[in-house]
Design a protein with these regions (language model features):
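Catalytic domains of carbohydrate-active enzymes, especially glycoside hydrolases
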Residues: 51-77
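Active-site neighborhood of glycoside hydrolase catalytic domains
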Residues: 173, 180, 185, 192-264, ...
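Active-site clefts of carbohydrate-active enzymes
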Residues: 247-266, 309, 313-345
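Substrate-binding cleft of secreted/luminal carbohydrate-active enzymes
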Residues: 279, 287-300, 320-394
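Pro/Thr/Ser/Gly-rich low-complexity, intrinsically disordered linker/stalk tracts
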Residues: 382-428
Length: 437
């Protein structure tokens, strides 16, 4: 019979094992958004931008980041050599002006990320064609060719989501990326129909009259976005079945007041009602491969409590990986509700890893991690991401394990062991062995 001492030791071992598993999960998405709309790259020049990105990627690698979501299409312009759209002003300062000396940031980033064992997801903004800060559109901007496909909303120019030809256009842009670049994912964020502004209404009367087919206008707008998400998903997987399609929606689906059955106990803007984004439907139908809701508030927020929302999303994760979008600035700016001498990172990470359906997180934004605000990067490096993690499994994309490598040998060098092997033969591009160590 097991004595009390042995039982106590066993319980202690099991507890330590469980804690270690929580701190070092085998599979976990550890992403970071690298955005261009904060003007961090504008006018830097080729060499300086490459130095900046190299430093950021090196630091993010030390912090255990295994996926980069790189913004390449902010407003119908491109940080890559697009076949459809002009070079971005966020790169050169003037929309339509190529970088000099010439280079392709997306191609360069893919190579740099893969060399560090990171995935690269090309992040595009599907409908936003011009923001307030853009004063002039290039002659090759799509609005110059087809102004009838767009509407103005305040100082924003939006491609009308209600027109079928607009869905086709965006899918053509994405197909161009897929055919020419070795991206691991296509990512879109929270900009669908525009965020509501006081005194403004969406000017889509003509489009609704033509395509509404008797539907309630709100339902029709949601269906427009649904059709786009489904078409983009099908487009991506038809061209490259292994490329992941992910979305990072606003952090509130619906408030309890609007939907007593599926709403969260919050009081804020809503995906479903205000942005016409039915995120739960996309997950249920399998139209997205992962979901990263932007839960950017703090624990204890009066209208959108982080604790409440992260639990809600975990309960509604469905059958697709759920990652949590984390706001680094807000996390380190807000005190822990129990210990005011600490910020909220520790409590947020503990909560995230304690919930059964959350398989990782994505940091908004990469530079805040690199700048180590509130020792955020240090804590990732030394504690939460101390050991590397594989990406979460997606069996609907690929459920077959790769074949074993052949003729594996080792060689000792002053930098440690080097491994050499012959890769297994693959029958298709999807099954070829590309391994980064």
């Amino acid at each position: 019979m097991m004595n009390k001492k042995s039982l106590l030791l066993l319980m202690m071992w099991l507890c330590s094992f469980a804690l270690q598993a929580q701190l070092s999960p085998k599979r976990e998405f550890r992403g970071a958004w690298i955005q261009c709309v904060n003007y961090q790259f504008m006018g830097l020049g080729t060499a300086e931008m490459q130095r900046t990105l190299t430093y950021q990627l090196n630091e993010l690698q030390k912090c255990g980041i295994n996926a980069i979501l790189f913004q390449v299409r902010p407003e119908f312009d491109a940080l890559y050599a697009s076949s459809f759209e002009p070079w971005s002003r966020y790169l050169t300062g003037q929309q339509g002006t190529p970088p000099s000396p010439y280079w392709d940031p997306l191609q360069w980033m893919i190579a740099q990320c893969h060399a560090r064992g990171m995935e690269l997801h090309a992040w595009i903004n599907p409908y936003r064609a011009k923001t307030k800060g853009t004063k002039e559109l290039a002659a090759t901007h799509d609005y110059r060719k087809h102004p009838e496909r767009y509407f103005w909303y305040g100082e924003q120019l939006i491609m009308d989501p209600g027109m079928p030809e607009n869905r086709d256009y965006i899918c053509n842009v994405v197909t161009d990326i897929l055919l020419r670049y070795d991206v691991d994912g296509i990512h879109i964020d929270d900009y669908f129909y525009p965020y509501p502004e006081s005194g403004l209404r969406i000017p889509d009367d003509q489009t609704y009259a033509r395509y509404g087919n008797g539907m309630n206008r709100d339902d029709w707008r949601r269906e427009n976005v649904n059709l786009f998400i489904r078409q983009l998903h099908d487009c991506i997987h038809a061209v490259k079945p292994w490329v992941k399609f992910g979305v990072s929606p606003f952090g509130i689906y619906r408030n309890l007041k609007s939907d007593p059955k599926r709403g969260s106990n919050t009081r804020g803007l809503q995906n479903y009602d205000d942005l016409y984004a039915d995120v739960l439907k996309w997950v249920k139908e399998g139209w997205v491969d992962y979901n990263i809701p932007q839960v950017y508030w703090e624990i204890g927020h009066s209208a959108a409590d982080y604790d409440t929302l992260i639990r809600w999303w975990s309960e509604h994760a469905g059958h697709r990986p759920l990652y949590i979008g984390q706001d680094v600035d807000r996390t380190v700016a807000k005190a822990d509700p129990v210990d005011p001498n600490k910020h909220q990172m520790e409590r947020k990470m503990a909560l995230q890893r304690s919930l059964p359906n959350i398989e990782g997180s994505c940091q908004w934004y990469a530079k805040a991690v690199v700048d180590n605000k509130g020792n955020y990067g240090t804590m990732l490096r030394n504690y939460y991401h101390r050991y590397p993690a594989l990406q979460p499994e997606m069996p609907w994309i690929d459920h077959k394990r790769p074949k074993k490598v052949r003729k594996l040998t080792t060689l000792w060098t002053e930098d440690g062991y080097m491994l050499f092997w012959r890769e297994p033969r693959g029958t298709s591009e999807m099954n070829l062995s590309l391994i980064h160590i």
